[in-house]
Amino acid sequence: MSERIEWLEDGTAGGSPYSPRFGDRYRSELGGLEQAREVFLKGCGLPNAWAGQPQWCVLETGFGLGLNFLVTWAAWKADPLRPRLLHFVSTEAYPASADDVLRSALTHPELIPFAEQLKRQLWGLLPGVHRLVFEGGQVLLTLCIGDTKAMLREPSFEADSVYLDGFSPQRNPDIWDVHTFKAVARCCRRGTRIATWTIARSVRDALAQCGFVVKKVPGTPPKRDNLQGEYQPAWEVKKSRITPERKAPARCIVIGAGLAGSAVAASLARRGWQVTVLDAASTPAAGASGLPAGVLAPHVSPDDSLLSRLSRSGIRAMLQQADALLQTNIDWSPTGVLEHCVEHARQLPAAWHPGQALADAAGDWTRPATSEQLKHCGLSPETPALWHVQAGWIKPARLVQAWLSSPGVSWHGNAAVSQLVRQAGAWQALDATGNELASAELVVLAAGHGSRALSEIASPQAGRPLALQAIRGQASWGLHAPGTEQAMPAFPVNGHGSLVPRVPLEQGLAWVTGSSFERDNTSPQLRPEDEQHNFGKLKTLLPAAAQALTAQFESGQVRGWTGVRCATPSRLPALGPLENAQDVWVCSGMGSRGLTFAALCAELLAARLHGEPLPVELRQADALLPQYATRLQPSGS
């Protein structure tokens, strides 16, 4: 449930927000806008401090109603000398509703357009890290839902500015104690500026104890003083606390022009890199990413496993990209997806059940399917099924094309890489005859199951190879005949194979079902037995839809598509720097969840490369490191 807020009449458009939990107002009598500008922006020397910088990172303790973020975003947009990238990281233990966030901004008309954009993305805020994207990926809001001390325990970034906000120290002492400030200090570099509205002695003493040099400065009437300072500890900062050096944008070779490679290329290009994408095929998305249409839906599990949590982060990232780059109802559609739990009734986490604390936020993601939704599928009301709200279908190839069209990205087909040679601080990608295809300071291996061989070329001293396994899949599809469309639901269904019922193609309206799953097979040939396998699965998944398509399957009118996926034993992607190979990274192993993970992994790679805030928790990101994809040797290798 969202945090309860009371709105006190004060003569303004929205009223004054008040927290019953803490018995305190969300903003001072000055108004939130003036406090944000005078206390936080001015207190941290913004916008002057970020002028001409490639990126800037603000850390805030206490997101509240988002006013400080909105004011900072507006200042960034109005500044001709703004940094290319603005990161805003904010912690919040008790997130407010999207409606209350918008209502809070109504008092300030200049902020309403920003608040409306923010409101559209404030959904599904379960505990953990949520990345919200604005301005075409140039303004990145990382919301850390949970206790500030816990969320900042393992920092992955260095803040340039810190806003210390929250209810008064008397009302909410935990966010102002020395343990919180130690967590904040772990995210700071020498010279990081901090600002806050409180000058309480306990706050000043705790900050000083954590390495901050602070001073009182004149406030805006009726506030007499504010507090400003810098992180200047008298001791040497331990190396274990120093985040990776922010790598300057340069040249990058991405090997592979599927979902993984094209997503990486676009993310790096947004940060100023010149990216060359090489692929052995003559067209982009020629491999597993060439599926006519794929289902985008989160994974759920009773214990809310690592895979489940990562899948939600991936879905959010992909929805943002699809909405920004693709044509709705032509290239993709956020229809929602019904999961028919054929083999067993998939259980939701106990904390998601109705009446529990997380029920509202979880319901933005997944909830039990309704009898009406089941009826549309031709299934009985007793059928075990889930409804994924934030889900739909996408044409992967169209997304690949959009990413490869990003400024700064150059794609080259018929460019099979046979050798990677490092000379004079750069990598050369060579073809089979030894001709140079491209050279760059950074290489990203995103060639599906081909990434394993490339990793062995780049790092011949590696102990064990990446356990990337080839998995052949065959999907079946066809154009709707008279009467078949009416027999199908308006949304995709998955759970035992999948069906995307309505995909607009140049030839007409199509359906797509599948797919088969065969390990260690890379054959591109279509096989009749796989077509029948897909039909058999569809009969179980959606009997009514299968019945409507029987004539097409029996008369040979069904078409086929085949591709080779790449997976790891953990079913998680392999993402990160390759061991024993300087400036070679891996982004592969997404299996059948390329649509789920491609956008997230690309942003995670870019964040780790530049020392930026991560779009997921650090321990989740670490679970994807390539060394963990060497633990099991794939069969048949």
UniProtKB/Swiss-Prot annotation:
Subcellular location, record wording: Cytoplasm
Alphabetized SUPFAM superfamilies for the sequence: FAD/NAD(P)-binding domain
Protein name, entry field: tRNA 5-methylaminomethyl-2-thiouridine biosynthesis bifunctional protein MnmC
UniProt record similarity statement: In the N-terminal section; belongs to the methyltransferase superfamily. tRNA (mnm(5)s(2)U34)-methyltransferase family.
Stated role: Catalyzes the last two steps in the biosynthesis of 5-methylaminomethyl-2-thiouridine (mnm(5)s(2)U) at the wobble position (U34) in tRNA. Catalyzes the FAD-dependent demodification of cmnm(5)s(2)U34 to nm(5)s(2)U34, followed by the transfer of a methyl group from S-adenosyl-L-methionine to nm(5)s(2)U34, to form mnm(5)s(2)U34.
Region of interest: Disordered: 1-20
GO cellular component, one term: cytoplasm
Catalytic activity, as annotated: 5-aminomethyl-2-thiouridine(34) in tRNA + S-adenosyl-L-methionine = 5-methylaminomethyl-2-thiouridine(34) in tRNA + S-adenosyl-L-homocysteine + H(+)
EC number(s) reported in the record: 2.1.1.61, 1.5.-.-
Chain intervals for the UniProt region annotation (tRNA (mnm(5)s(2)U34)-methyltransferase): 1-232
InterPro entries: FAD-dep_OxRdtase (IPR006076), FAD/NAD-bd_sf (IPR036188), MnmC-like_methylTransf (IPR008471), SAM-dependent_MTases_sf (IPR029063), tRNA_MAMT_biosynth_bifunc_MnmC (IPR023032), tRNA_MNMC2 (IPR047785), tRNA_S-uridine_synth_MnmC_C (IPR017610)
Signal peptide start and end residues: none
Positions of region (FAD-dependent cmnm(5)s(2)U34 oxidoreductase): 255-637
Single GO biological process annotation from the record: tRNA wobble base modification
Organism for this UniProt entry: Polaromonas naphthalenivorans (strain CJ2)
HAMAP family reported for this sequence: MnmC
Keywords on record: Cytoplasm, FAD, Flavoprotein, Methyltransferase, Multifunctional enzyme, Oxidoreductase, S-adenosyl-L-methionine, Transferase, tRNA processing
Cofactor(s) annotated in UniProt: FAD
A GO MF term: tRNA (5-methylaminomethyl-2-thiouridylate)(34)-methyltransferase activity
